[in-house]
Structures are given as structure tokens and as C-alpha cells.
């Protein structure tokens, strides 16, 4: 079996080496971050040296060692997603969809003319719908007498790959669609995968990026138990210092980012910026 695997890998490498690989360009951006709810706002606040770290507002941190994080602020979900639909989505999926909506709008390709069979979605996420998991399990633990009554959207809201699926369904994209989950490298791996899909000629456009929303009791409590989070509660803005001898852990954040990756000739043919 190892020899057979080597043979297939070797054959694939020869095949790739003889292919004319496509060039890939970025034609659209989307971002929802603790520094801003658009790419422009995020960039300007970054240039101004602002920090997104502040006391946590998502839940009561009285009993937690870490009481601050980088939350997305002042975001009206319903500016992008219908209120009824938003209730069916975990926060991480909401953020992912908003970043994708911004990216698709920025790329400005004609949704009526583009070949949707060659437009894909590949997103990365480290954890997924942890807040949904927390809410459902907490309710069952607090009310066992009611029996196992779970929301029918529990699993669809929680699973890690739902964001890429929701984005595809929103636009009717039928190209490559999957999620990469590799902890802090998830989004980088998603972009690398999207890049390769286009390079190999399997898609013309990939909506790619990453999202996470784990600022909840389970998320913060779990990382606190690992002694992984900073507890510099008196100075949140300067707590993230990975290269300092006085570092004491990372600072949790939430948000989403999107790059519209596109095959060069396809982008030029439609007059992309």
C-alpha cells in the first residue's frame, strides 16, 4: 500500500509539472473585525494604532480569570442578513456571511452572467458554532426534567462547515465548497486551498477567508483552563505582546475576513479592478 500511494503521488506530481498553471489575483475584499465592520474602517483604525481589546460584553466574566477580548462592535447583522434567517445562524456564520457579502460586492462581478458552477467557497474556522453548542447543552443541563429537547437548528448552526455552505446557498455557487479546520492556521489553509483550486483550473472564482466567534463562557473558560489567555485585565490594550519577555498569553478575538480570488484572464475579461 505505501508503494501504491507513492506511485499515485509521483504520477500526480508529473501531471502537475506538465500543466500550464493559472495565475490568481485578488479582486475583492471583505472584513468584519474588532477594529471596524468594513475593510476600510479596519484599515484606517489599524493605521491609527487603535486596539480592539476591551472588557467582554458578550457574557458575565465575574468568575473568569480573563475579562477582556477583542469583540466586533456596533454591527447590525440585519443590514446584511434577514432577521428571520439570522436567527438560524451561529454568530460565526453570520460574520462569515457578512465578510463574503462585502467581498462579492467589492469584486463587482455580474451574478447573472458568471458561471456559478465555477465559483466556489472555501472558508476556514478553528472551532465553529461553540456558542450554539454552549446554549443548547446548558439548557439541557439546567432542565433535565424536560428531556432532551434540542433546537432542530442545533446541528446545522454548530457544525464548522456550515458557513461555506450558507454562503454558497446565498448566491447559488456550485463550485468547490468546503471548510478547513486547522486551529490558528485554518484561514491560511483555506486561502491556500482556494489558490490551488484556481491554479489547477477547477474554478474561476473562489470566495475564501475565515471566521471565528468563540468569545463565550466555553471559549474563554476552555482557554483559561489551558493557561493560554492573557489575564492582564488592567491593561487590555497592551495585553497582546507575543514577542515580549513579559507576555502571559494571547488575547481572544472574533471576526471574519474574505478575499475574492480569481483567475487572472477571467478577471481581465470582465474588466475587474
Residue spans for each PLM region:
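Short, positively charged and aromatic/hydrophobic N-terminal segments
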Residues: 9-16
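A broad detector of short, well-ordered amphipathic alpha-helices
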Residues: 40, 94-101, 188, 192
Amino acid at each position: 500500500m505505501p508503494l501504491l500511494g507513492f506511485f499515485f503521488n509521483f504520477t500526480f506530481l508529473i501531471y502537475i509539472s506538465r500543466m500550464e498553471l493559472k495565475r490568481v489575483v485578488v479582486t475583492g475584499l471583505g472584513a468584519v473585525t474588532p477594529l471596524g465592520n468594513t475593510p476600510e474602517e479596519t484599515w484606517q483604525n489599524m493605521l491609527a494604532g487603535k486596539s480592539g481589546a476591551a472588557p467582554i460584553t458578550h457574557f458575565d466574566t465575574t468568575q473568569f480569570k480573563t475579562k477582556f477580548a477583542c469583540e466586533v462592535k456596533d454591527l447590525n447583522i440585519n443590514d446584511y442578513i434577514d432577521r428571520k434567517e439570522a436567527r438560524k445562524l451561529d454568530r460565526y456564520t453570520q460574520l462569515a456571511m457578512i465578510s463574503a457579502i462585502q467581498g462579492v460586492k467589492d469584486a463587482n462581478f455580474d451574478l447573472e452572467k458568471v458561471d456559478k458552477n465555477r465559483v466556489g467557497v472555501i472558508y476556514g474556522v478553528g472551532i465553529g458554532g461553540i456558542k450554539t453548542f454552549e446554549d443548547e447543552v446548558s439548557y439541557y443541563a439546567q432542565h433535565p426534567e424536560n428531556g432532551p429537547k434540542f433546537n432542530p437548528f442545533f446541528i446545522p448552526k454548530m457544525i464548522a462547515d456550515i458557513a461555506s455552505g450558507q454562503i454558497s446557498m446565498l448566491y447559488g455557487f456550485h463550485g468547490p465548497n468546503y471548510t478547513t479546520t486547522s486551529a490558528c492556521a485554518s484561514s491560511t489553509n483555506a486561502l491556500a486551498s482556494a489558490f490551488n483550486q484556481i491554479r489547477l483550473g477547477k474554478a474561476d472564482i473562489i470566495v475564501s477567508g475565515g471566521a471565528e466567534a468563540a468569545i463565550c463562557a466555553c471559549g474563554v473558560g476552555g482557554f483559561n483552563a489551558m493557561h493560554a489567555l492573557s489575564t492582564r485585565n488592567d491593561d487590555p490594550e497592551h495585553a497582546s505582546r507575543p514577542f515580549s519577555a513579559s507576555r502571559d498569553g494571547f488575547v481572544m478575538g472574533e471576526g471574519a475576513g474574505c478575499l475574492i480570488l480569481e483567475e487572472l484572464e477571467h478577471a481581465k475579461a470582465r474588466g475587474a479592478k
